[in-house]
């Protein structure tokens, strides 16, 4: 019996520890590269959508709308449009990643990898958060040329952008698995 066990013993038994950091990083990088390959569709398109909303709403409402909490309406509108794109793209990235994997049949490649469910979920969530934060940064840069944006606390902006995108990307994973 010992001879059989030695004959079929795996020679290079790889031990990952509690977390498979290499697999986690690889999946995260795969998800980030998935949206960076089509940057016009994933980064520029949400920016153009936000700009169109900004222009259409500012033209439709115009100067008829007074100030909101002491700020001009367009200054009040711009952060809301940025937040809208952050949560929308976080949800879209994670749910479409799962759905595309299910439809194309390549989700089995991820499921066969030595990754736990938490590692797969966290890598997908963080990739969606990365996409959302990139969209937020690009939108802030472009909107700052059009609208006077006022920042009161950068730490709050970073924390709430990350948490909002993380929550919506988690919901996107649930919807992607359920659909």
Model regions and ranges:
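Short helix-capping/hinge motifs at transmembrane helix termini and TM-loop junctions
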Residues: 57-66, 88, 143-151, 179
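Hydrophobic alpha-helical transmembrane segments of membrane proteins
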Residues: 66-97, 159-173, 177
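Short alpha-helical transmembrane interface motifs in multi-pass membrane proteins
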Residues: 14, 38-41, 76-80, 87-92, ...
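Hydrophobic/aromatic residues in alpha-helical transmembrane segments
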Residues: 52-57, 94, 138, 170-171
């Amino acid at each position: 019996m010992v001879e059989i066990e030695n004959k079929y013993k795996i020679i290079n038994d790889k031990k990952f520890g509690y977390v498979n950091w290499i697999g986690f990083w690889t999946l995260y990088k795969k998800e980030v590269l998935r949206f960076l390959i089509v940057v016009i569709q994933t980064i520029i398109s949400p920016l153009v959508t936000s700009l169109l909303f900004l222009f259409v709403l500012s033209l439709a409402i115009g100067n008829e709308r007074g100030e909101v909490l002491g700020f001009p309406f367009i200054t009040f509108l711009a952060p809301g449009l940025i937040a809208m794109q952050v949560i929308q793209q976080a949800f879209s990235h994670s749910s479409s990643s799962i759905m595309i994997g299910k439809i194309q049949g390549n989700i089995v490649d991820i499921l066969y990898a030595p990754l736990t469910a938490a590692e797969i979920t966290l890598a997908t969530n963080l990739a969606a958060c990365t996409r959302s934060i990139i969209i937020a940064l690009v939108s802030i840069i472009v909107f700052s040329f059009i609208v006077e944006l006022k920042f009161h606390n950068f730490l709050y902006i970073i924390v709430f952008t990350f948490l909002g995108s993380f929550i919506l990307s988690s919901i996107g994973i649930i919807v992607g698995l359920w659909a």
